[in-house]
């Protein structure tokens, strides 16, 4: 049982989701409210990510998958995209050492072919540095699109059928899951138990559509840079009140 003190009553958590997905939304609006450029919000968002990752690790969460950059985000202003692509470099220098000290392991899913070399290098260094850590997995969805992930999986499966590796009748949900990008995660925890979206938007925006089939969804008006340990506890508290039926009664 984890307890966080608050003025009116304690937040008590008895059921901790093994895998949490977060759509980190609202950096630009957070900056605008402070009359700052959008990139100011992205920097503040990295502080929030570090704090939430450590808080989740302390709770015993096994995987935290964060939607860092979607395949649709390339349509944003070029200067903003350039800044976002440089964030992994800054993240490695400023935040990864502390996360490494907290036994966090870093992984990445998404289409890496379009990412700049410096971005890829920073991500690979973070992955390599933390690969032997046994704590929480911080899984970045970077240049990720859920529908494209499924299309790519179908193409690979079709090719393997043509190569006579298995028959169409052998295709199951489990086999398809093995062809998705999240196959790099521990088998029992590939699908998020809880998906959190900040900033008040009420949609998944192409985030893990296959894996989210039975995820509990939690939407909050809190902008991502303001999402902290208490906000995480409140989301998990709501998760504790849910009854997950998985299609049953």
From Swiss-Prot:
Its EC number is 2.5.1.-. Binds 2 magnesium ions per subunit. One of its GO terms (biological process) is polyprenol biosynthetic process. It is an enzyme of class 2 (transferase). The active site is at residues 25, 73. Gene3D superfamilies: Decaprenyl diphosphate synthase-like (3.40.1180.10). NCBIfam families: PRK14830.1 (NF011405), uppS (TIGR00055). Homodimer. Belongs to the UPP synthase family. This is Isoprenyl transferase.
